[in-house]
Amino acid sequence: MAPSGSLAVPLAVLVLLLWGAPWTHGRRSNVRVITDENWRELLEGDWMIEFYAPWCPACQNLQPEWESFAEWGEDLEVNIAKVDVTEQPGLSGRFIITALPTIYHCKDGEFRRYQGPRTKKDFINFISDKEWKSIEPVSSWFGPGSVLMSSMSALFQLSMWIRTCHNYFIEDLGLPVWGSYTVFALATLFSGLLLGLCMIFVADCLCPSKRRRPQPYPYPSKKLLSESAQPLKKVEEEQEADEEDVSEEEAESKEGTNKDFPQNAIRQRSLGPSLATDKS
C-alpha cells in the first residue's frame, strides 16, 4: 500500500501539468499577432490593438493586463491583437506610432486611439459601455489604408532595410563606418540619376516635343524690290530738285552781287577826288 500511495502524488502532479499545458497554450492564443501580411483583417469587425516593443518597460507592465483582457474577448465580441513594432516597422509608420505602448480601437475600418487607464477593468468597460463612441475617429487622410500612410509605411520599411544593410556592412563585412556611408551615398546618387532619366523618358513619351524644321531665309521678291525702289527714287528726285533750286538761288545771288560791285566801285572812284579837295 505504501508504494501505491507514494506513486499517487507524482501521478496527480503529472496529470495536472498535462491538463494545464493546453490551457495555458490556449490562453496565450487569445491575443492575435498582427503583421504586414494580415493587417487588413483589422478593417472588418471590432478590434483592440496594442503596439509594443519587447524592450519597453511600460509595455512589459501592460502585458499581464492585456493577456487577462484577451480572455474576455469572446464574451465582449471583440478581437484582441498586438503588434511588435521592432519586427513590423511598416505598421508603426502606417499607424503613426510615436509612443509606446499605443492602443487603438477599430470598428469596421474606423480607428480611434485609446487614451484611458490601462487596466483590465477599464478595457472591459471601454468595450461594454461603448465609450469609444465619444472619441473622434482618425481622419481618412491619416487612416492606415490611405495613400499617405502607405507611403509612410514604405518609408519606415526602407529605413529598417538600410539599417540592416549598414549593420551587415560593418559587422559581417568589416567595413568602416565611413565606408558604409560611402556605399549608401553612391547608391543614392546612381538611383537618383536613374530615376531622373526614367522620368524624362516617361515625360517625352507622354508629351513628345514637336520638331521644328529650319525655315529658309526669306529673300525679298522682285515685286517687293521694285515697290520698295519706287519711293526711294521719288525721294532722290525730290532731293535733286531741291538741290537744283538751291543752286539756282545761289547763282542769282552771286550775279546780283557782281552787278552791284562795279557801280559801287565807280561811285567810290568818283567820290574819291572830291573828298580829297574837301579835306585840303
Curated annotation (Swiss-Prot):
Protein's GO biological process: negative regulation of platelet aggregation; negative regulation of triglyceride biosynthetic process; positive regulation of ERAD pathway; regulation of calcium ion transport; response to endoplasmic reticulum stress
GO cellular component, one term: extracellular region
PANTHER family according to UniProt: DUMPY: SHORTER THAN WILD-TYPE, THIOREDOXIN-RELATED TRANSMEMBRANE PROTEIN 1
Gene: TMX1
Enzyme Commission no: 5.3.4.1
InterPro entries: Thioredoxin-like_sf (IPR036249), Thioredoxin_CS (IPR017937), Thioredoxin_domain (IPR013766), TMX_domain-containing (IPR052454)
Protein name as annotated: Thioredoxin-related transmembrane protein 1
Remaining remarks: Mediates reduction of intermolecular disulfide bonds between chain A and B of Ricin toxin (Ricin A chain and Ricin B chain, respectively), thereby releasing and activating Ricin A chain.
Biased composition (Acidic residues): 237-252
